[in-house]
């Protein structure tokens, strides 16, 4: 199998359905797809602040709905007749999953079942990518990266629900899309992405949004676990990979499979190191602004629920298969985050900043 020569030009005129399109990654994906000339239908809960700022709603077909509602979801599929489906709708926060495990499992497991059922019942779909997480693996606190053939068994309700989502995808692929046994021809893949950072993430209990909120309030940044290690990557990195994978398997089903999507080892850093980088980048950006508070942080443990201490992905497979490598390291990612945040705080042109960063990335 030769390496796939991917270009965003592939998406011109393609019908793409994105679940979770109003969220952080979903909004960036829609902006990217719109720029490529795709016909995008989105299905998600009420819009996030970023989605409203990004000015994509009038450029796509945006449907507000819940992936737990199979009937409504199927109606959207029937009307859109998508060729490609990217499933990103989820309850994505570990701590929220401890507070509401039932909702987390309903959304992340049965939501995946419902989306795959719609794919099964929609003949136009040729390519499906389920976006999960690096946390699907049984975490043994190993110092090396997890590979795609490692055991799936997330610890907390969020991580475990995503492990289940992987199993659901595998079952549907084997049961309904196995062409050797008379199944319908549709390429099915999963993408297991590391921790994503970028401008416009307003979620609670995520470190970069916590940093930005602290700066907005003129406060010191609180870091609850500075020693945990995560595979941090700029938001456009995994989005590019999802779209590359969806395009490749659309044209050649042999590309379908399970793929880790993460940074190089040098960008697998502790939370404390990431916040150090944020503070350095923030202070450099506002060096000549006497009114700007200097960024600094302190460690304050809140004795919260269990979260993994060390987590890293082995991304050899996607690199070998597609010849892909991360475009930006986290220092460049942080520069873009500060640029986006400065534009936001000053009431600037957010769509222009997003398009600028997408253009530079591509």
Predicted regions and their residues:
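C-terminal substrate-binding subdomain of Rossmann-fold SDR/epimerase-dehydratase oxidoreductases
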Residues: 1, 35-38, 215-362
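N-terminal Rossmann-like NAD(P)+-binding domain of SDR-like oxidoreductases, especially those catalyzing
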Residues: 1-193, 344, 361
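Generic recognition of short, well-ordered alpha-helical segments
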Residues: 28, 75, 96-99, 110, ...
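Short, solvent-exposed loop/helix junctions and linker helices
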Residues: 19, 67, 106-109, 158, ...
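Asparagine-centered polar/low-complexity signal
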Residues: 107-108, 114, 195, 225, ...
């Amino acid at each position: 199998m030769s390496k796939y020569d991917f270009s965003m030009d592939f998406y011109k005129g393609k019908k793409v359905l994105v679940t979770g399109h109003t969220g952080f990654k979903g909004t960036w994906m829609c902006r990217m797809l719109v720029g490529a000339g795709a016909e995008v239908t989105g299905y998600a809960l009420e819009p996030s602040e970023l989605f409203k700022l990004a000015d994509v709603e009038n450029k796509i077909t945006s449907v507000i709905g819940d992936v737990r509602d199979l009937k409504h979801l199927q109606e959207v599929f029937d009307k859109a007749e998508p060729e490609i489906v990217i499933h990103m709708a989820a309850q994505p926060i570990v701590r929220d999953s401890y507070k509401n495990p039932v909702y987390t499992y309903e959304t992340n497991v049965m939501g995946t079942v419902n989306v795959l059922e719609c794919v099964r019942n929609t003949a136009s779909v040729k390519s499906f990518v389920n976006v999960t997480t690096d946390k699907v693996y049984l975490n043994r606190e190993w110092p090396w990266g997890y590979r795609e053939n490692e055991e799936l068994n997330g610890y907390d309700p969020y991580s475990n629900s995503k492990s289940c989502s992987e199993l659901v995808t595998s079952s549907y692929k084997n049961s309904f899309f196995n062409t050797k046994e008379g199944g319908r021809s549709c390429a099915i893949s999963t993408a297991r992405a590391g921790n994503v950072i970028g401008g416009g993430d307003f979620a609670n209990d995520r470190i970069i949004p916590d940093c930005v909120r602290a700066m907005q309030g003129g406060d010191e940044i609180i870091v609850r676990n500075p020693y945990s290690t995560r595979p941090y990557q700029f938001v456009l990195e995994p989005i590019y990979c999802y779209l590359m994978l969806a395009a490749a398997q659309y044209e050649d089903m042999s590309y379908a499979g399970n793929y880790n999507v993460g940074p190089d080892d040098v960008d697998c850093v502790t939370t404390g190191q990431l916040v150090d980088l944020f503070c350095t980048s923030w202070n450099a950006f506002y060096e000549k602004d006497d009114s700007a508070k200097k960024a600094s942080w302190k460690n304050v443990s809140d004795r919260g629920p269990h979260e993994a201490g060390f987590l890293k992905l082995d991304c050899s497979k996607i690199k070998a298969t597609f010849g892909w490598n991360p475009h930006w390291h986290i220092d460049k990612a942080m520069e873009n985050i500060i640029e986006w945040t400065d534009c936001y705080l000053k009431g600037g042109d957010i769509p222009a900043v997003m398009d600028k960063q997408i253009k530079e990335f591509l």
